[in-house]
Design a protein with these regions (language model features):
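A short, Trp-centered hydrophobic/proline-enriched beta-strand micro-motif
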Residues: 175-183
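Beta-sandwich/jelly-roll carbohydrate-recognition scaffolds of carbohydrate-active enzymes
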Residues: 168, 186-200, 215
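A short core secondary-structure module
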Residues: 206-207, 211-256
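Flavin-dependent oxidoreductase catalytic core characteristic
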Residues: 3-148, 157-158, 163-164, 171, ...
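Short, glycine/charge-rich beta-strand/loop segments that flank catalytic centers
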Residues: 146-153, 184-187
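Sequence-specific dsDNA recognition surfaces
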Residues: 194, 254-262
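Short Gly/Pro-enriched turn/cap motifs at secondary-structure boundaries
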Residues: 187-190, 216-219, 236, 262-269
Length: 642
């Protein structure tokens, strides 16, 4: 399994960079974090081993983390409710400078920066709770703070920066300097092998000359410091490759060409940035040449946890809005929440909101503990939270009917409470695209999920491996599968007494245990059936990952309910697990009984233009500009000239 590969092997026709499919896959593979030095609940789950001991007892924050975090949240809540008008941000599509300054004065720019470097030193848990709080007030504020800290300069510096870099940059970043992360280009999204931006060594290697255009630079319009990914050409003394640089956003040659506008998150400072021979000192490279993509991917292992936090917050807000409206609105003689059609939606929102918070809190606490490798758990959390929160918001809009489609401003203008259901729907939509689209996330997780299989049997299915190496792989595979496969037949999930301490939740944990083994068996069947072609069965792999995500959420919901110890929490966990199990069972059916092949064939006919007759009778107001602007011809007004 590699990321990504198109079914059928058709190579993209339009190339702005002469990069083969194989080269793209190789770059993605060498940029992976290959070591598994700590246990992983997610990895074990996909292998059919339900390691409840890795998440139960549910981890808890330290007293110091709680004291520091609760005090910070209290100040943040007071600031938001007293000093920030979310309607102003939504109306003007901009966070006022006074608000940004107030956030900086409060310490919000350094929430997850260590106190050693002037930050607030919040744990992952309380950093997530702070983002949830700000995101529930207005999404643009949470986006500003998370883009600055979760993927901006502070996070890669935390893991890969030198001590000198940390002492130089982290204090101002924790105080009043805003950062941004720049990877995407007009023709480069999930395939960084096509990157055009270059950093050419100059001055005998003492500096680099950075040139290129970066797109969708969240915070880039107002940022002071940037972490930029650029390709260093291979030359004598330079290994080359995609590398990470800290760049002064005000340096000569840095130009913000355009401030982008989106369907949601109004107020986001996202733009297009051009670099024209910008000098970057060698000491401002993070890590070594060629390590940039690896740094970016490993940074996201924990950086991705910001999105589950804001998605969980949105789901919780949707529950409040749905509950209040379903109790207030009366149709056919009773509140609409008493009609089964609406009651089912309320139940879905309630169960999902509980599960999303459980996933977010457990993932964050596991990151704080540093006892487990959470790359799979964090990726599953991001994928699951973004998909489910969107469905929750859609159901809220449906429950509120016409008022769900009406803006908060319009509702207030005619004397009703400004419940911005349509706003949360618009704001959440990008979560399925931000920091790895759901489709790419499924492929990334699938690659990690089958890592054990590839390590023991990869040479058996690889096309260019010599026979002696295949023979060795066959021996390894026989030894591994001879022990592994029999263990997938029976387990604790078949014993009625298993997990008895969980009471009413025990049947659901037994289901997770049984189903994890079933998931592992089906993954193996897919590998046996398609072998090297499995990487092209993206729909199959996507369903495998979706099943794993549901099992992860069920596990988190159960251990959280057990920790909380209330009947209410137990009720919601049972509710959610029942809903999730039905989705899982359907996904298993779809693994082997589907229309994947016929749908793929039809899509190729669509691409070939065979069905263009369907497009007749409509007008296209989009104009005739290119669908993708070339990197050397990026247009737009100059927001901040270089």
């Amino acid at each position: 399994v590699s990321v990504p590969a198109a079914p059928g092997g058709q190579q993209e026709v339009r190339h702005m960079a002469a990069v083969s499919e194989q080269q793209s896959r190789q770059l993605a593979e060498v940029s992976r974090q290959t070591e598994w030095e700590k246990p992983s609940f997610g990895k074990e789950l996909f292998l059919g081993r339900f390691r409840l001991d890795l998440i139960y007892p549910h981890p808890v924050p330290t007293d110091a983390d709680s004291e520091r975090g609760e005090a910070f949240l209290a100040k943040l809540e007071a600031f938001l409710t007293e000093q920030v008008d979310p309607a102003e941000i939504e109306r003007d599509a901009k966070i006022p400078e006074r608000v940004i300054k107030g956030l900086a004065d409060l310490g919000c720019l350094g929430m997850n920066i260590s106190e050693d470097y002037g930050g607030a030193g919040l744990s992952h848990l309380y950093y997530g709770r702070a983002l949830a709080l700000t995101g529930s007030w207005h999404s643009a504020i949470a986006t500003l703070l998370s883009a600055h800290q979760s993927i901006g300069v502070p996070e890669p510096l935390r893991w890969f920066g030198s001590e000198e870099q940390k002492r130089k940059y982290l204090p101002p970043l924790a105080s009043n300097k805003i950062s941004a992360f720049l990877l995407t280009e007009p023709d480069v999204g999930s395939d960084p092998a096509r990157m055009h931006a270059t950093a050419v060594p100059v001055e005998n290697g003492a500096a680099y000359e950075l040139s290129g255009v970066k797109l969708w630079t969240t915070n880039g319009v107002i940022a002071d410091l940037l972490v930029v990914m650029a390709d260093v050409p291979r030359s004598e003394g330079h290994r080359g490759g995609i590398s990470a640089f800290i760049v002064d956003a005000h340096a000569p040659g840095v130009t913000v060409l355009h401030r982008n506008k989106f369907m949601g998150i109004r107020g986001i400072e996202n733009g297009v940035t051009r670099f024209d021979k910008v000098r970057v000192p060698r000491e401002d490279m993070i890590g070594d040449e060629g390590r940039g993509l690896k740094i970016a991917l490993q940074t996201l292992n924990t950086g991705r946890l910001s999105l589950p936090a804001t998605c969980a917050a949105s789901a919780k807000w949707c529950l409040k809005a749905a509950r209040e409206w379903a109790a207030e609105r009366v149709q056919w003689g009773q509140p609409i929440g008493r009609h089964e059609a609406v009651a089912k939606k309320l139940a879905f929102i309630a169960g999902t909101a509980f599960a999303l918070e459980a996933v977010m809190e457990l993932s964050s606490l596991m990151a704080d503990e540093e006892r487990n490798d959470i790359r799979i758990e964090a990726a599953l959390a991001k994928l699951y939270a973004s998909e489910m929160a969107w469905k929750v918001a859609d159901e809220l809009v449906q429950i509120r009917g016409g008022r769900g489609f009406e803006t908060a401003e319009s509702l207030e203008a005619r004397g009703e409470r400004g419940v911005g259901a349509e706003q949360v729907l618009r704001d959440l939509r990008i979560s399925r695209i931000f920091e790895g689209s759901s489709e790419i996330m499924r492929l990334f997780i699938a690659r990690e999920a089958v890592d054990q299989h590839l390590s023991v049997a990869g040479d058996l299915i690889a096309p260019n491996v010599e026979l002696p190496d295949k023979a060795k792989a066959a021996g390894r595979a026989a030894g591994f599968y001879g022990k592994w496969l029999p263990r997938l037949a029976v387990g604790a999930g078949h014993l009625p007494s298993s997990f008895a301490e969980f009471g009413p939740l025990a049947p659901h944990l037994r289901y997770v245990e049984r189903t994890s083994r079933k998931l592992a068996r089906n993954t193996f069947y897919g590998m046996a059936r398609w072998q090297g072609g499995l990487e092209r069965r993206q729909a199959f792999l996507g369903r495998i990952v979706d099943i794993g995500a549901e099992l992860w959420a069920m596990s988190a919901a159960c251990v959280r309910a057990k920790m909380l110890g209330t009947d209410e929490a137990g009720d919601l966990a049972v509710l959610f697990c029942g809903q999730a199990a039905r989705r899982v069972d359907q996904s298993f059916r779809d693994l082997w009984h589907n229309d994947d092949a016929s749908e793929y064939a039809a899509a190729q006919q669509v691409l070939a233009g065979r069905y263009e007759f369907i497009e007749a009778g409509v007008l296209d107001p989009s104009g005739d500009l290119p669908l993708i602007a070339s990197s050397d011809a990026a247009a737009g007004e100059e927001i901040r000239p270089g």
